[in-house]
Amino acid sequence: HSDINVIQLNNPDEFKLQWHKLKFHKINFGGIPTGEKCLILDIDWIITGNIDDILDYDLPERTFGCFERWWSNLRSFCKINGGFQMFYMGDTHQLWTTFKKAPEHWQEYYIKEGLAVGPVNGEQNFIDTHISLDRVWLPMEWFAKHHEDEYFKIQLNWHMEVNKKEPYFMSGEFCDTIKMVHFSNANNSMELIKEDWINDFWY
């Protein structure tokens, strides 16, 4: 598509996997003008509803848009989902400068401290720890995670934290409020899961 600008990594081995996302916070990354609204999304999201409310979200200046990963029992270690970050270009440059000073240290730190599960992880912990802007929390009911191995835990957290009346997922359908579904975790590949709803929304 002519409106899509693909930016190749100059050195894919410079950082470990998802830690490359920290580059997005470098001021004017990809030629994006200072002050332009940015949204970082991981590639393992599936859009299941109307996301206009997300794309048009009125994020105040000098704030960081995120949501609480309600499905996790480790929120005391890291509250945000690193696969969704909303900000204005230039406001988060400090994340990049802090990381760039000691990338080897930070890429191992949260795993060594028992705050993230290896072999590669911790970038969302880094952002959660080092973001200096006020946070704006988008509604939790817009977002969900799908992981068959954690279904009952996710369902329980949904009822306890988000919606006591409706299930988050039943008979191949998500709750009407859910707009995006994340397949986080290294062993949770959406292309390997054979469910009709994935075909309906993704392929």
Name these PLM-found stretches.
Residues S2-I4, G49-D52, M190-I193:
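Short glycine-/acidic-enriched loop or helix-start segments at secondary-structure transitions
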Residues V6-Q8, L17-I80, M86-M89:
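GT-A fold catalytic core of metal-dependent nucleotide-sugar glycosyltransferases
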Residues H1-L17, F29-T34, N185, S189, ...:
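N-terminal anchoring/stem segment of glycosyltransferases
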Residues N11-Q18, S72-N73, F143-D149:
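A short acidic, often aromatic-flanked loop/helix-cap motif at beta-alpha or helix-coil junctions
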Residues M89-Y203:
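Catalytic core and acceptor-binding pocket of nucleotide-sugar-dependent glycosyltransferases
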Residues E14, Q18, L74-C78, L115-V120, ...:
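Aromatic-acidic/polar surface patches that form glycan- and anion
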Residues I80-N81, T177:
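A generic structural signal for well-ordered coil/turn residues at beta-strand boundaries
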Residues L9-N11, F67, L138-E141:
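Conserved beta-strand termini and adjacent loop/short-helix elements that scaffold enzyme active sites
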